[in-house]
């Protein structure tokens, strides 16, 4: 690139035009002094613009006449002096200057003929007649912009203007300008949702295994493409939203069942099955606790035999004589006493208490705390058998026998309590029979 090719432009560029001095131009050639005076003091009248005929006759008018002296010194005709030292240029010098410049010759080849009247209007009558023109004091950038705005349309046979740097006079160092690169569009990342063939830890669900294949290309005639890539990896079906894809996947999930081997109940979680099977294990018998609860009942005034109504089919305690089952061991003991009382009646007129013979054979207890008082007269006896014999012999009229079993009680409330507990399904009017009937008024 030659020295001075790039010109630093400021906001106010100096009115100096770029020109290349040719070698054949004489160094000592200078303009006459009257041209400088005409430039500093132009006349107010503006002649008509130069015609193309005058442009062709411009080389013949090489010796201009001096302007009349009357134009100088007239205050009315003198305009404001120009502050920029612009020198007038003849047509030959203008053509040599702009055609010699590589920028003007290459960029604006038709500038000398098409815009000569615009760039170089005549400033006076004398100068216009002699074919002289004055260059206005403008910068190179403003002159180029004005010439481009006011330049007439080229004729059809005219050649298009060459781009800078492509003409024959262009320097090899000037690189051709490249068109602006198109803005790269941001690559849209496609969202792919691939299924992981795993086993779900929730409720024993297991996903069917299937070969994972790359997604198939979508057909152009299948309608608009869904917003997201929601594709099932098992059957390669596309869905427009994740909810539809989730509903489709639920149909492909296999439910694992956990069945109880004893009752064949189905569970979906192995932990639920384990907690269920604990109920099938047999519980330890509670006979010891039931016996401890029934001990106070056996120490009643009169032992009552087992009731027939207490037997049930689902009982755990079975009688060895009649094959009846009882839910509690105390009920079975009372029932066995009834069998013994039916076998050993000693006195036909006196009712025997069940188990009296066995109790009589047992050695009497000499402990003072084991004395049994009579509920009628208050006499104490060392054993239960002697107490019962005393009551049977002396207080037989005050006994309350049970109507439904051979048990005998010493008071009406005791008999009522026995019937309500051991004979709930029988007729309870037996309580009313024990009450003496009042005489009618």
Curated annotation (Swiss-Prot):
Residues 1-12 have a biased composition (Basic residues). One of its GO terms (biological process) is negative regulation of transcription by RNA polymerase II. Pfam families: zf-C2H2. Residues 1-20 are annotated as: SNAG domain. Disulfide bonds: none annotated. This is Insulinoma-associated protein 1. Its main location: nucleus. InterPro entries: INSM1/2, Znf_C2H2_sf, Znf_C2H2_type. SMART domains: ZnF_C2H2. It comes from Xenopus tropicalis. It is found in: Nucleus. Signal peptide: none annotated. Residues 1-31, 43-189, 205-224, 278-316 are annotated as: Disordered. Belongs to the INSM1 family. A zinc finger (C2H2-type) spans 258-280, 317-339, 372-395, 400-423. Residues 74-83 have a biased composition (Polar residues). GO terms for molecular function: chromatin DNA binding; DNA-binding transcription factor activity; RNA polymerase II cis-regulatory region sequence-specific DNA binding; zinc ion binding. Residues 138-147, 169-180 have a biased composition (Low complexity). May act as a transcriptional regulator. Plays a role in noradrenergic neuron, pancreatic and gastrointestinal endocrine cells differentiation during embryonic development. GO terms for cellular component: nucleus; transcription repressor complex.
């Amino acid at each position: 690139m030659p020295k001075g090719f790039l010109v630093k432009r400021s906001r106010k560029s100096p009115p100096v035009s770029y020109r290349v001095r040719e070698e054949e131009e004489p160094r000592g050639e200078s303009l006459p002094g009257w041209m400088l005076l005409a430039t500093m003091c132009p006349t107010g009248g503006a002649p008509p613009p130069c015609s193309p005929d005058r442009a062709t006759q411009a080389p013949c008018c090489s010796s201009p006449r001096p302007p009349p002296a009357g134009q100088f010194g007239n205050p009315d005709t003198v305009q404001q002096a120009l502050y920029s030292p612009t020198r007038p240029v003849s047509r030959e010098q203008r053509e040599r200057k702009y055609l010699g410049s590589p920028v003007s010759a290459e960029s604006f080849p038709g500038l000398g003929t098409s815009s000569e009247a615009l760039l170089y209007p005549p400033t006076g009558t004398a100068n216009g007649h002699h074919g002289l023109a004055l260059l206005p004091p403008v910068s190179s950038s403003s002159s180029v912009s004005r010439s481009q705005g006011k330049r007439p349309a080229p004729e059809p046979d005219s050649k298009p203007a060459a781009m800078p740097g492509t003409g024959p006079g262009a320097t090899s160092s000037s690189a051709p300008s490249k068109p602006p690169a198109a803005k790269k569009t941001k690559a849209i990342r496609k969202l792919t949702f691939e299924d992981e063939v795993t086993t779900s830890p929730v409720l024993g669900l297991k996903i069917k295994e299937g070969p994972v294949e790359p997604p198939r290309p979508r057909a152009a005639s299948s309608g608009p493409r869904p917003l997201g890539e929601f594709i099932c990896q098992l059957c390669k079906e596309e869905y427009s939203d994740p909810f539809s894809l989730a509903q489709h996947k639920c149909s492909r999930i296999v439910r694992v069942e956990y069945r109880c081997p004893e009752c064949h109940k189905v569970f979906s979680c192995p932990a639920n099955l384990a907690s269920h099977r604990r109920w099938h294990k047999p519980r330890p018998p509670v006979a010891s606790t039931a016996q401890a609860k029934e001990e106070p009942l056996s120490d009643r005034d009169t032992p009552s035999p087992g009731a027939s109504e207490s037997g049930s089919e689902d009982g755990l305690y079975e009688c060895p004589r009649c094959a009846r089952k009882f839910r509690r061991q105390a009920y079975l003991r009372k029932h066995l006493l009834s069998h013994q009382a039916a076998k050993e009646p000693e006195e036909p007129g006196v009712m025997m208490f069940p188990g009296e013979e066995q109790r009589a054979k047992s050695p009497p207890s000499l402990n003072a705390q084991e004395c049994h008082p009579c509920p009628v007269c208050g006499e104490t006896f060392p054993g239960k058998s002697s107490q019962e014999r005393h009551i049977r012999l002396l207080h037989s009229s005050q006994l309350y026998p049970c109507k439904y079993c051979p048990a005998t009680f010493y008071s009406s409330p005791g008999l009522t309590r026995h019937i309500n507990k051991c004979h709930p399904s029988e007729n309870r009017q037996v309580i009313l029979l024990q009450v003496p009937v009042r005489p009618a008024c």
